[in-house]
């Protein structure tokens, strides 16, 4: 499982937690936002990370500073494209990490407000 399947698993998990889907795979010249959800009145920009092995760390550890800058730039583009003022619209960045463990079970980690 990779890419689209990992995002589908993350989306299903977030829906179970009560969030509603706004859009998926928003792309712009700055990068991509995997999933955009709504949590009550707050927009949630979600980066999904999938790791099939933990020898180099867990999935959520792979949201490094360079990726974060690109992600934040993509959020700015999304806000501009949709005529949303980031100063007035509550929003946050979350990471959903999916780690496949040795027993082929998936461990989902959801970090809010990163």
Swiss-Prot record:
<dbReference type="InterPro" id="IPR003509">
    <property type="entry name" value="UPF0102_YraN-like"/>
</dbReference>
<dbReference type="InterPro" id="IPR011856">
    <property type="entry name" value="tRNA_endonuc-like_dom_sf"/>
</dbReference>
<dbReference type="InterPro" id="IPR011335">
    <property type="entry name" value="Restrct_endonuc-II-like"/>
</dbReference>
<protein>
    <recommendedName>
        <fullName>UPF0102 protein Patl_3694</fullName>
    </recommendedName>
</protein>
<comment type="similarity">
    <text>Belongs to the UPF0102 family.</text>
</comment>
<dbReference type="Pfam" id="PF02021">
    <property type="entry name" value="UPF0102"/>
</dbReference>
<dbReference type="GO" id="GO:0003676">
    <property type="term" value="F:nucleic acid binding"/>
</dbReference>
């Amino acid at each position: 499982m990779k890419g689209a399947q990992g995002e589908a698993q993350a989306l299903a998990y977030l829906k179970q937690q009560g969030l509603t889907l706004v859009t998926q795979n928003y792309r712009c010249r700055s990068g991509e936002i995997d999933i955009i959800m709504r949590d009550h009145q707050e927009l949630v920009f979600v980066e999904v990370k999938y790791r099939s092995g933990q020898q180099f760390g867990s999935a959520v550890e792979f949201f490094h500073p360079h990726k974060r800058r690109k992600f934040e730039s993509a959020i700015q583009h999304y806000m501009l494209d949709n005529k949303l003022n980031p100063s007035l619209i509550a929003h946050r960045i979350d990471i959903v990490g999916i780690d496949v463990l040795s027993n082929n079970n998936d461990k989902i980690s959801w970090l809010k407000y990163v």
